[in-house]
């Protein structure tokens, strides 16, 4: 009997170990199976996520589609990311949409480097990208394919291009999914590794604050921005509104002359149409857009928003420009000056007729079957979200570009910074001269004339990427440089506090084109300045403004040839400064599309804004975070104001830092400090259209470059402990109703792979465990019956008690009651890969950095490797 028990136990152990082999397969094999399952789209979708090579060409195509989704609510925005299959520089040269307006309201294709989520797809309300994103393609209303001109492409990959595509689809009416079908809307892009001489980009002009009153027959939404980047050549345009839009028109305004870029009804297929006539847009031109709406039939006001009941006013201009200084994406969101639009061509006010049949088809395709009462109630109760077409609600944080070598430039006290029309950084510094307590007497007369002017070049033109000095000027001309501004023609406008003068210096000239003020003579009349600090130039009129200054608390306006026009401002008379009072107006910036001039009122710790033409006070921006001083201010298109404050006074705790502000309401959007060195006296700030910001420090003798980065990876320190902010992750969890499978293509293979393995094992082992637990019981019962039958034959009825004991021993051991027996419940509950919840709890410590010892990482890259692209022929 002991021998029989031993054999039975060995048989059970064999079966159990066989069970573990079936249940807990190799993580490598499971992960391979997971990879294979993600290599193709849903069975309901045609196509593949892998690149498809073009026969006889180095080009390849990539299907970018939704992975078979079924929205459950109307006005759902879903996003999905796709990794560029190669890291090398490449170019998108063609788009082919796969979409139908009966299902999708519109779709957009973004380019970026850090998608907002690693999921297979996600709710776009959690964001599209965590870094700067650019629109590469847009589709709506059954628009036909877009064909790029020969030699033109959207740059992707490499050092400066996007590594990810993010597809966003707006699903309008959920009634289209009553049959529960799975949607695979998307676009096929054709990519070539061959370098394109011309780089494509998109200029987006859009309104953020248009209101369409109910019943009003004609409502105009006007947008205009001064263009100050290298020349672009528009070749296609696309318009976008919702139901109330009648026509959208875009123009180039040059020296008062309006030239049509494109005009179309937004109720027709929203494709990219060819521009009316070939033209170029150069620095100094104005890009103006008008959307014509009607409020007829509405019972309540209609606002800008992302739902079908809201409205939008968007004009996309697809352009190309020389690859040497290409910019892939630009925006304009400023409300147009009414005086400018008094001269808009009448054609912009004429709706484009759309046949009733076409209109009905569009309405049915959008699923706009809402009653007026529903529209009125929803408009009143819902705070409309802005559609992702706007690309403005990105959580952007500025961080120092630590790879930029410009911080180590050998310069003196940096007093002024600006960007020229070619987007080069221009630095105005004091060389070996220093402003200290011995520089002036009590009457503000400069005391160190005997040492002569600064002999080295005080104006340096620096490459914004490499910090290489491209050009230098300003030798033997200045004593104590201060402010710097560059106009649309590339002229330098500078001030010298020792000379008490303002200079206009040509970019290619050694001698000034214009000089205002009397050298070394401070004064307060119209022909004198007293330590003037800065200049701002109105790009439309050419008039310029002088902040004067350390000892005159005023702003002066002059004509382009230097004739005095007007002045305003007075010295602060109390601890509660009134509007228009200054205590060192230290820095100026033009808000040209608003017709405003903003002043950094340094010692009053605030920013004041005025109507440029009249000097009338508009508003002030003041925050406790500013502390007691605001040194400089700079405006960038898109409604963002940048500023830097001063070092805290003794006993104050306000840090010296940079600020990113919402110009419309003055709110602080972000603060930033350098990673290398420290701010000592940040004296000037310059902001580019692409979100890049430069700060010059007069005490640290340094210039820093700050670039936008993903805000959710920003860390804050509390009591010396660094804490990672995960707000954005929490938002993902809140918005997602059902978590789709994880998409490994966003670089999270190491972190997510164990989870995939365990889930797969758990799914396989459940059925096997139940089955294999039954089999040994049946086998053991059969063995027990066989043994009993043998003993009955050998010993007859006397063995009844022994057989009961033996049988109880075997079954008792199986039940875990016998001492030294095998407890199956304990065995499975403690075996690797199994727990009461189906799998072991994963370690959360260090999972982002470390791999399993058993995995060398080689296999985890299979999913992302693309077939090698044939080299470009040298012929």
UniProtKB/Swiss-Prot annotation:
Region feature (Peptidylglycine alpha-hydroxylating monooxygenase): 3-394
Assigned keywords, A-Z: Copper, Cytoplasmic vesicle, Disulfide bond, Glycoprotein, Lyase, Membrane, Metal-binding, Monooxygenase, Multifunctional enzyme, Oxidoreductase, Repeat, Signal, Transmembrane, Transmembrane helix, Zinc
Record localization: Cytoplasmic vesicle, Secretory vesicle membrane
Membrane-side (Intragranular) residue stretches: 40-763
Topology class, membrane: Single-pass membrane protein
Catalyzed chemical reaction(s): a [peptide]-C-terminal glycine + 2 L-ascorbate + O2 = a [peptide]-C-terminal (2S)-2-hydroxyglycine + 2 monodehydro-L-ascorbate radical + H2O; a [peptide]-C-terminal (2S)-2-hydroxyglycine = a [peptide]-C-terminal amide + glyoxylate
Signal sequence, start to end: 1-39
Membrane-crossing segments per the record: 764-787
Details of cofactor binding: Binds one Zn(2+) ion per subunit. Binds 2 Cu(2+) ions per subunit.
Gene Ontology biological process terms, A to Z: peptide metabolic process
Top-level division of the source organism's lineage: Eukaryota
Ranges in the topological domain labelled Cytoplasmic: 788-875
Residues annotated as binding a protein: 430, 550, 602
Entry cofactors: Zn(2+); Cu(2+)
Region described as Peptidyl-alpha-hydroxyglycine alpha-amidating lyase: spans on this chain: 395-716
Stored PANTHER family: PEPTIDYL-GLYCINE ALPHA-AMIDATING MONOOXYGENASE (PTHR10680:SF14)
Quaternary data: Monomer.
Name of the protein: Peptidyl-glycine alpha-amidating monooxygenase B
Organism encoding this protein: Xenopus laevis
Gene assigned in the entry: pam-b
């Amino acid at each position: 009997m002991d021998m029989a028990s031993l054999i039975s136990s060995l048989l059970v152990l064999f079966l159990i170990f066989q069970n573990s082999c079936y249940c807990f397969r190799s993580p490598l094999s499971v992960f391979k199976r997971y990879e294979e399952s993600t290599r193709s789209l849903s069975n309901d979708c045609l196509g593949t996520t892998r690149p498809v090579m073009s026969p006889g060409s180095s080009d390849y195509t990539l299907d970018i589609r939704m992975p078979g989704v079924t929205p459950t609510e109307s006005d759902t925005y879903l996003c999905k990311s796709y990794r560029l299959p190669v890291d090398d520089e490449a170019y998108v040269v063609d788009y082919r949409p796969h979409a139908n307006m009966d299902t999708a309201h519109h779709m957009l294709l973004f380019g970026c480097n850090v998608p907002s989520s690693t999921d297979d797809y996600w709710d776009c309300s959690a964001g599209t990208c965590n870094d700067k994103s650019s629109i590469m393609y847009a589709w709506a209303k059954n628009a036909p394919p877009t064909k790029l001109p020969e030699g033109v492409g959207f740059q992707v990959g490499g050092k400066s291009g996007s590594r990810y595509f993010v597809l966003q689809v707006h699903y309008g009416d959920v009634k289209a999914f009553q049959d529960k079908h799975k949607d695979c809307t998307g676009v096929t892009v054709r990519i070539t590794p061959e370098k394109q001489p011309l780089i494509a980009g998109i200029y987006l002009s859009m309104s953020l604050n248009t209101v369409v009153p109910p019943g009003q027959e004609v409502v105009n939404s006007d947008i205009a921005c001064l263009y100050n980047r290298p020349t672009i050549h528009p070749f296609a345009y696309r318009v976008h509104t919702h139901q109330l839009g009648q026509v959208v028109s875009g123009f180039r305004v040059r020296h008062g002359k309006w030239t049509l870029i494109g005009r179309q009804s937004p109720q027709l297929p929203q494709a990219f149409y060819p521009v009316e006539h070939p033209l170029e847009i150069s620095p100094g031109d104005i890009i103006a857009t008008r959307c014509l709406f009607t409020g007829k039939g509405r019972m309540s006001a209609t606002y800008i928003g992302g739902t079908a009941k809201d409205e939008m006013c968007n004009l996309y201009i697809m352009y190309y420009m020389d690859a040497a200084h290409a910019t892939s994406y630009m925006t304009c969101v400023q409300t147009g000056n009414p005086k400018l639009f008094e001269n808009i061509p009448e054609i912009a006010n004429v709706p484009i007729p759309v046949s009733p049949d076409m209109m009905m088809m569009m309405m049915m395709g959008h699923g706009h079957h809402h009653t007026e009462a529903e529209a009125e109630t929803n408009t009143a109760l819902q705070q409309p979200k802005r559609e992702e077409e706007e690309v403005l609600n990105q959580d952007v944080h500025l961080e120092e570009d630590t790879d930029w070598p410009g911080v180590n430039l050998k310069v003196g006290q940096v007093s002024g910074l600006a960007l020229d029309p070619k987007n080069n950084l221009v630095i105005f510094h004091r060389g070996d001269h220093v402003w200290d307590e011995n520089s002036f007497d009590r009457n503000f007369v400069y005391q160190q004339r005997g040492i002569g002017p600064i002999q080295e070049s005080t104006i340096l033109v620096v490459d914004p990427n490499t910090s290489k000095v491209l050009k230098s000027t300003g030798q033997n001309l200045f004593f104590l440089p201060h402010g710097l501004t560059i106009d649309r023609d590339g002229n330098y406008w500078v001030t010298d506090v020792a000379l008490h003068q303002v200079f206009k210096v040509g970019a290619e000239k050694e001698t000034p084109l214009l000089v205002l003020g009397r050298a070394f003579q401070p004064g307060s009349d119209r022909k004198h300045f007293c330590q003037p600090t800065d200049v701002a130039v109105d790009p439309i009129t050419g008039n310029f403004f002088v902040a004067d200054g350390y000892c005159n608390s005023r702003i002066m306006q002059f004509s382009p040839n230097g004739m005095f026009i007007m002045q305003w401002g007075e010295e602060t008379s109390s601890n509660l400064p009134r509007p228009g009072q200054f205590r060192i107006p230290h820095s100026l910036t033009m808000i040209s599309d608003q017709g405003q001039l903003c002043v950094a009122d340094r010692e009053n710790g605030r920013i004041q804004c005025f109507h440029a033409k009249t000097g009338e006070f508009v508003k002030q921006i003041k925050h406790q975070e500013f502390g007691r001083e605001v040194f400089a201010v700079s405006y960038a298109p898109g409604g963002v104001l940048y500023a830097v404050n001063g070092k805290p006074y003794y006993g104050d705790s306000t840090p010296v830092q940079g600020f990113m502000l919402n110009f419309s309401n003055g709110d602080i959007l972000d603060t930033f400090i350098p990673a290398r060195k420290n701010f000592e006296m940040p004296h000037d700030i310059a902001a580019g259209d692409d979100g890049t910001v430069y700060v010059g420090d007069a005490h640290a003798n340094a210039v820093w470059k700050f670039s936008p980065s993903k805000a959710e990876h920003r860390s804050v320190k509390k009591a010396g402990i660094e804490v990672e902010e995960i707000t954005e992750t929490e938002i993902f969890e809140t918005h997602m109703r059902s978590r789709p499978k994880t998409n490994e293509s966003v670089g999270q293979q190491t972190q997510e792979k164990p989870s995939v393995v365990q889930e797969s094992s758990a799914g396989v082992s459940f059925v096997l465990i139940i089955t294999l637990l039954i089999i040994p019981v049946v086998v053991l019962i059969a063995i027990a019956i066989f043994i009993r039958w043998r003993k009955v034959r050998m010993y007859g009825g006397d063995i009844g008690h022994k057989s009961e004991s033996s049988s109880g021993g075997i079954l008792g051991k199986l039940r875990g009651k016998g001492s030294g027996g095998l407890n199956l419940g304990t065995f499975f509950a403690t075996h690797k890969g199994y727990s009461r919840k189906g799998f072991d709890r994963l370690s959360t410590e260090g999972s982002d950095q470390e791999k399993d010892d058993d995995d060398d990482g080689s296999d985890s890259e299979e999913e992302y490797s693309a077939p090698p692209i044939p080299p470009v022929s040298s012929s």
